[in-house]
Amino acid sequence: MAVPPRPMVASFLLLIAASFVGAQEKPLRETIDVEIRKGWDAAKLKPVSASDSVFLRRIYLDLLGAIPTYEQAKAWLADSDSQKRTKLIDRLLADPRHAAHQAQFLDLVMFGRNPPNGEATRKRDDFRQWLADRVAKNTPYDQIVREILAGEGEPGIFYAQYRGNAEETAVGVTKVFMGTQVQCARCHDHPYEPLTQVDFFGVAGFFARIVYQDGAGGPNGRKFKLGEKSTGDVLFVGSQKDAKPGQKGEPVKPKFLFGDKLAEPVLPAGFKEPDLKTVKEIPKPAFSRKEKFVEWLVKPENPFFARAAVNRLWAQYMGRGLVHPVDDLSEKNEPSHPELFTTMTKEFVARKFDVRWLIREIVNSQAYQVADEGPIADAHPSHFGRARVRPLTVEEYVAAVKTAVDYDAANPMAKGKLPGAMSEYMLRFLGEPFDGRGDFQASLSEHLYLNNSAEIAQMITPKKGTLGGLLVESKDSADAKVERLFLSVLTRLPKAEEKQRFGVFLAPVGGNVAARETASRDAIWVLINTAEFRFVR
């Protein structure tokens, strides 16, 4: 097996680790703007700041996963306070919906929509609530990850998705929490990176003793048992092309990625593993490989952990990581802004992995608050000179429609809930999370769904107290009705042409209630099907 040039790896790790000292005095948002502007100046870009209405909708969706109400939008847009953006950010970060939204984002990073082996429903709601509680308390990120990878209680669902497969667990843990892709070295040494099969199986060795057992209900039940044995190793047979039928391979001891092997105590003579199928709870081992990996992972000097977190949070709010893709932190994949990435990582560690602080600094920056405008030729994503445009997730889309039409006003018993469960179709067509990818492509199926969805039709039907009902019953002028419609749905005032056209549309010839209800419903339907509503910009 070829051995990669380890000095390159060592210098790479030392360079990063050496930067983790102290915190700077000036706000990080200022450093962000200075470093990003260097790129703008070099590329001769002149980005413009987003309008208040665009910023308002963007920050609500990014921090809460919802849009502002009509009353909130009207009041904030009329506010003349020069610090209103900063004050709004602080208010939204303290809103309980932010914790739920951020927990949902992290949950999707860890599991996606459809995790393997049917674990999408197992304790998923319990885990999201647990995670939301941690976010609400601003629990340090390293502590959250410690609890997740301890594998006890609600966080145990993370390991459950891999059902005791050490190799799959290694791939998932390194991708999510270290931002690295190690799966290529599962079958052969990486052709371009200094990553070998020994590295891969060394990491997998930390998870070789995880035990997963289905509980009541079998694979389709909600209960399962998760624990760790005192014995067991992964087996390595060499490269796939050299493997022979029936060959079991050699046991591989745990080894930290690009680091040393784990020093383990010797088990007592005559030690015998208990029959795990008969015990009520899987006993904890006297020495846990998994715990040793977690201790190493979250250390401040670990060059992967903090960088992966910073890069993913930056991508969440800026549309693209400083290293792109977000889960490919490697020696050959350089960041677009190396100095900024180093400073942000150093500050994140110095602030004891304070996620809320980091989010606040990112969204308060001028770089975050740019408009999605400018010449297409200047729209290179790594410059961050234009705001990213991303589709709403299914949760955001439903929350936005519900808020726009004031659905809860007519359905007080369903406050905060969807009009029925999110259907399989809605999840299929609208639900994939966005983490900096640029490959969104609307489909005919999505278009047909938005045109014919029973869920959406139910939400926009005019009822007393809803937007549709107010447009039907209100004695306000046509201009006032159109302003309410646009502020409610698009978080902005209508343009002159829109005001004229929608004013005529909302006052149909004949003027009977049925005609007004149809006009009201259709006007709302038109706006929620615009690209302006479907996307965050």
Regions found by a protein language model. Give the residues of each.
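N-terminal secretory signal peptides that target proteins for export/translocation
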Residues: 1-6
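Bacterial N-terminal signal peptides
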Residues: 10-19
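Boundary at the C-terminal end of the N-terminal hydrophobic targeting segment
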Residues: 21-25
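Primarily short, surface-exposed interaction patches in extracytoplasmic proteins
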Residues: 26-53, 57, 67-97, 111-409, ...
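Conserved AdoMet
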Residues: 101-104
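Catalytic and ligand-binding motifs that coordinate phosphates/metal ions
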Residues: 403-429
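Adenylate-forming
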Residues: 432-434
